Amino acid sequence: VRTQSPLLRHINDSPEIWREMWRKQVDLSCIPYYMFVARDTGAKHYFEIPLEKCWDIFRKAYSQVSGICRTVRGPSMSDEPGKIQLLGVAEIKGEKVFVLRFIQGRNPKWVDMPFFAAYDPKATWFSELRPAFGKDYFFFEHEFPTRPMYGDGFLFE
C-alpha cells in the first residue's frame, strides 16, 4: 500500500507531523509516496500554504527520517501539463528561483527535466508562477495552444 496526503494549513503544516506520519506508515508496512500541495480549488484560501513553505516542511521532515521512509516525493502539484515537483529554491545567475521537475508529464520527454520559475514568496500553486530568467514561457508550453495570463487561475485551458 502506498500513501499520499495533501499538505494543509491548520491541519498538517509542520515537519514533525509529516515525519511521524511517514514513520508510522512504514511501521504499518505502508510506503510513503506523495506529499501534495493543496489544490487550487474550494476553500483554497483557508488551506493553502506558500510553495516555499511547502518545500521547507517537506525538506525538514525528509531529513529526519531513515531511508525506508525516503520513498516519498513532494511537494507535488497535479496540474494540466502533469505532476510537478518542487525541488527547492536556488539562486542562479543572481536570480532567486524555484527549481521544478515533472514527475509525470503529458509528454514523456518532460519527465525528470529540471526547469525554473521566478521566485514568488506568495505563490501557492503552479499557475501563479512565471518562467525564470525573463522567459515568456516554460519549455513545455509551446505544445499547448492557449493559456490565460499568469495568476488568472488555470494555466492551460
PLM regions: where:
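Charged helix-capping and loop-helix junction motifs
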Residues: 16-21, 50-52
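Auxiliary Fe-S-binding modules of radical SAM enzymes
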Residues: 26, 31-35, 39-157
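Radical SAM/AdoMet-radical enzyme domain recognition
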Residues: 1-19
